[in-house]
Amino acid sequence: MTKMLKRVLQDVLSQEENEQLISAFDQIGDIIIVRIPDSLVSKKQIIGKTLLEQVSTANSVFYQSSPVEGDFRTRKLEVIAGEDKTQTEYKENGCRFIVDVEKAFFSPRLSTERERIAGLVKDGEVIINMFGGVGMFSLLAAKNTPCTVYNIDLNPVAAQLCKENVQINKLKGQVISLNGDATKVINEQLVGKADRVLMLLPERSDEFLDSALNGLKDKGIIHYYSHMHADKKQDAGKLSEEHFMSVNKTNAEIITSRNVRPVGPRFYQTVVDVKISKN
């Protein structure tokens, strides 16, 4: 959407200003979120007004004024056009989700990875989603295949939205929303229960690896996400495999690895799918 953003704004920004737009915008339901470089923050109102006029399905435009940060993985947003409301409905692959784009973590840029994971799940699996947010990965997996998913999140807003999304999608009993620290929840309730564990907190995966292993059955699978620096895009997956093997202390078999998305110049979010043998 970077090219689309530049095209939409070409009549309200100078050519020099237009070239400074370095990021695409995200549309989540009827909300647009745009990142604006510091050099163009003074133009944020006209940018918001123009986006609202040009994108017919949008009712709100927000400027993202901080990165995603903190234990709750939230960001600061400032309304620059339209309605000042951060909750919306988002649809993906047959599921409906209520999301709050400021109070709970959510990214539309992970839809391909969500679809991939849902396609891997087998009938009857028990899954632990350690940093599950509003339940996107969890509900899509359960909608696709009969399974049980424990969706853990530290953020009480995310956990409550997950409960609402379970009701909306008629998946009560298949997706269980648990509010708390993933390590504590696993150690107290879920030791050795999971056929599959999702670790969707790439910047802190090393810290939580032992907890993921505690929740896993013998021959279970971990989806281990990380951020990797690579001069060549095609090298990032292999580097992530090497990194996992350097921090893992168990008998592990790499199934596959892949780039999920770029997150910065020569930085990539990657995932390694690993089978763990405990015995």
Predicted segments with their positions:
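SAM-dependent transferase fold signal centered on methyltransferase-like domains
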Residues: 1-279
